[in-house]
């Protein structure tokens, strides 16, 4: 692990979005005591997808996570529902929906997914992080991102969410693709909503009301209530069709000039972070505040109420989520050339 100051994609995104958020998360190291369900779901799903792609037993991994979480999962049952059971159901359906030969995973140093990296991108600044996976379809090569969602992002959102293309440069620097170049990003979407449970009518039959659910859930309810599957073929078929709502892979081609443009912007942000870490904490109020972990603190500050009480009640100090991230220290950076066609001299 490098002793030089590090910058990650999450740090850059937070810095650009709201410096107050960055200050809370990466300078004060505040974290919510209770993780929101979407984040908890996404983290666990990432863990078992890693095991799945690497050829291990995802359900064994899920059982380990449940054992480790033990009491915490029990305490959150009323608020989140049985998140472990939901993840198991959704993952098994995902595995059936997308067989392993639906794409070709490109291994890196014998590993199929979750590729950690640490590379000096500016003299004195290290970029670190983790790439979900690399894959190929036909003759095209893609950088893969696992994304869990509550509402599927549309194309208008996806074209704005291009920050992951900075990983293109990292892969080139590391030489993981040889002479090949990426054609774009593969978004591997998985719906995080717990499948709805079909209702049983007074006569013992299954309600035909349309639900967003999955076939295995329908079959389980039918089995538990002694309902013959031949009597509910329409319900099962609808549930099978709804798998498309749960699992989508969308491939977004990326222009090489866009990669250089975003990369150079990332370098500028990295320099800003190193120069101003702990010094700037301007609040940027906007729609993003609705889902920001630190909204309660900012709201209390704006209303003139006790922020210390909010912090003590709802937050704790933790090291950064990525164990390899370190607190940036100011350096005098010298720019590394981002591309042969776009050379800029050093300077912050």
Report residues per predicted region.
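RecB-family 4Fe-4S metal-dependent nuclease core
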Residues: 1-348
């Amino acid at each position: 692990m490098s002793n030089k100051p590090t910058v990650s994609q999450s740090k850059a995104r937070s810095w650009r979005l709201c410096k107050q958020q960055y200050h809370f998360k990466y300078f004060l190291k505040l974290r919510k005591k209770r993780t929101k369900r979407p984040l908890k779901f996404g983290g666990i799903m990432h863990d078992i997808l890693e095991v799945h792609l690497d050829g291990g037993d995802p359900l064994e991994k899920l059982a380990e996570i449940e054992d480790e979480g033990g009491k915490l999962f029990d305490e959150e049952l009323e608020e989140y529902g049985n998140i472990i059971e939901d993840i198991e159901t959704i993952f098994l359906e995902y595995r059936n929906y997308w067989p392993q030969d639906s794409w070709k995973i490109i291994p890196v140093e014998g590993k199929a997914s979750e590729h950690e990296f640490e590379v000096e991108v500016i003299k004195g600044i290290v970029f670190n992080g983790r790439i979900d996976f690399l894959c190929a379809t036909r003759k095209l090569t893609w950088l893969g991102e696992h994304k869990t969602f509550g509402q599927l992002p549309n194309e208008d959102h996806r074209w704005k969410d291009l920050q992951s293309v900075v990983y293109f440069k990292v892969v080139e620097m590391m030489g993981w693709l040889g002479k090949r170049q990426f054609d774009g990003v593969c978004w591997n979407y998985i719906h995080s909503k717990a499948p709805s449970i079909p209702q049983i009518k007074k006569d013992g039959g299954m309600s035909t009301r349309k639900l967003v659910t999955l076939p295995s859930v329908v079959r389980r309810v039918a089995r538990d209530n002694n309902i013959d599957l031949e009597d509910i073929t329409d319900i099962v078929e609808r549930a099978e069709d709804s798998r498309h709502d749960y699992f989508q892979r969308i491939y977004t081609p990326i222009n090489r000039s866009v990669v250089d443009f975003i990369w150079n912007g990332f370098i500028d942000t990295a320099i800003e972070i190193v120069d101003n870490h702990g010094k700037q904490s301007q609040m940027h109020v906007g729609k993003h505040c609705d889902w920001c972990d630190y909204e309660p603190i900012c709201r209390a500050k704006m209303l003139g109420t006790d922020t210390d009480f909010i912090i003590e009640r709802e937050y704790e100090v933790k090291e950064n989520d990525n164990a390899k991230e370190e607190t940036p220290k100011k350096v005098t950076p010298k720019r590394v050339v981002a591309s042969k066609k776009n050379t800029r001299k050093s300077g912050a």
